[in-house]
């Protein structure tokens, strides 16, 4: 089968012909119909998440097939699989655990000590087929197409969990940093659907701000031409934001947006740009603010976002479908901040 693989750090993905895997036991072979392109794939190709090197520090073994936003049809199942059969259209939770560690036992499989992350340390969906380690990580699609569903498995899961951690309600104000991208537009939709909070979207390009508006943002701020701190203070009548979801965590965002938090505000950190957080420690105590890490999501988050999307309450803003062989172009678009919404590869 054709697969776009990371063979060498810092180099374009390479199209290779590799064997189609054979499922056994609880495994399922999926014929890919859609693979979303995530900013994590930029970091994978660069070979690092901030200062963490994917090979030396995170144990990723090359070559590996990228792509962790996955939807397709079941091609073949192992002999221990129940409830699924050939032809079923499914979305795949790529954040899988081995099942035995402490974190797996408490339902936080995505934090597994020996994770099985498709497209990271297991071969992923930038291919014609992908082998899923366990059928429990599948979700049967009823209303959604594969192209609509694929981005939900990362951008949807990630922002669903981040919104949960933001502890929102209709009285609260949420600021979304990076509001016009795939994660940003998803975060806005989810927050509106589950909380009714007032949402301020921040980005640096007008087309991204338009995407944030379409997703449901009540206010948008162009951080390249406006003072975001004063604008957020104005919108909130001086109170500040009850929560910030930072989808970048860059040096610039972390130097600005922690200071827009209201008392008891929550700063939910999602992005992996690799900057250091520098914040005047007494303010944490005096204002009772919290800095919260949020990494993708667990199986409960996966089922939650899929149910929400199947009910029509959120919809991925897929702006472009591309061929499998165009994976490098799609990653380039993300790396150079040219992508709006979500790009999806269709093998």
UniProtKB/Swiss-Prot annotation:
Its EC number is 1.1.1.1. SMART domains: PKS_ER. PROSITE patterns: ADH_ZINC (PS00059). Zn(2+) 2 binds at residues 98, 101, 104, 112. Its cofactor is Zn(2+). InterPro entries: ADH-like_C (IPR013149), ADH-like_N (IPR013154), ADH_Zn_CS (IPR002328), GroES-like_sf (IPR011032), NAD(P)-bd_dom_sf (IPR036291), PKS_ER (IPR020843). Transmembrane segments: none annotated. Zn(2+) 1 binds at residues 38, 68, 154. One of its GO terms (cellular component) is cytoplasm. Keywords: Metal-binding, Methylation, NAD, Oxidoreductase, Zinc. One of its GO terms (molecular function) is zinc ion binding. It holds the Pfam family ADH_zinc_N. Binds 2 Zn(2+) ions per subunit. It catalyses: a primary alcohol + NAD(+) = an aldehyde + NADH + H(+); a secondary alcohol + NAD(+) = a ketone + NADH + H(+). The modification N6-methyllysine is found at residues 11, 213. Homodimer and homotetramer. Belongs to the zinc-containing alcohol dehydrogenase family. This is NAD-dependent alcohol dehydrogenase. It comes from Sulfurisphaera tokodaii (strain DSM 16993 / JCM 10545 / NBRC 100140 / 7). The lineage of its organism: Archaea, Thermoproteota, Thermoprotei, Sulfolobales, Sulfolobaceae. The gene is adh.
